[in-house]
Amino acid sequence: MIYCLETMETNYKYTIKKDPEKGILLVNEQGEVVDATDILEKCGDRRVFAFDGKMGAGKTTFIKHLCEAMGTEDVVNSPTFAIVNVYEINANRLPDELKVESLKFKGEIYHFDCYRIKDLIEAMDMGTEEYLYSGNYCFIEWAEMIEPLLPEDTVWVKIEVEENGERSLSFEV
């Protein structure tokens, strides 16, 4: 199932492949290998991304790849116990083609793992709404735990494990 807002109209689907030399590759429907930031570019000004997938589907792995493609030099790992990790974007580390104003890769990235959040009160007490409405990128695992707090234009990204073991990634904007 793909989560979407009623105003969404374009579907995107990618295959996530592992390459022994290059690491994770994102392949679009035309079979072209694209940068992970291709997803962000297609979503325009949206900054909050809710990642949906079963345990072990690759949510954290893909978010790590995405953060690195955005220019962070920080160690990206699962914030399971911290609930939120903050990564700085180093725009100087980005390739020239990604230093465009429309992508606005600057500031901080907030990476949430909401698996351990007990209820909305706990989420609000830790200041979740301040992160979500900060204008910075927010990548959220197990976002259904805080769904009522999410902005209306949140992009729901579905990661599924296919029968052949490859991962597929889909979203709508």
What kind of feature is each model-predicted range?
Residues 11-38:
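N-terminal pre-Walker A segment at the start of P-loop NTPase domains
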Residues 59:
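Conserved lysine of the Walker
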Residues 51:
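Hydrophobic anchor at the beta1->P-loop junction of P-loop NTPases
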Residues 1-15, 89-107, 173:
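Short, basic, low-complexity termini and linkers enriched in Ser/Thr/Gly/Pro
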Residues 72-87:
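Short beta-strand-centered segment that lines the nucleotide-binding/catalytic pocket of NTP-utilizing
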Residues 56:
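Walker A (P-loop) phosphate-binding loop of P-loop NTPases
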Residues 12, 18, 102, 118-173:
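Short phosphate-coordinating micro-motif centered on Lys-Gly-acidic
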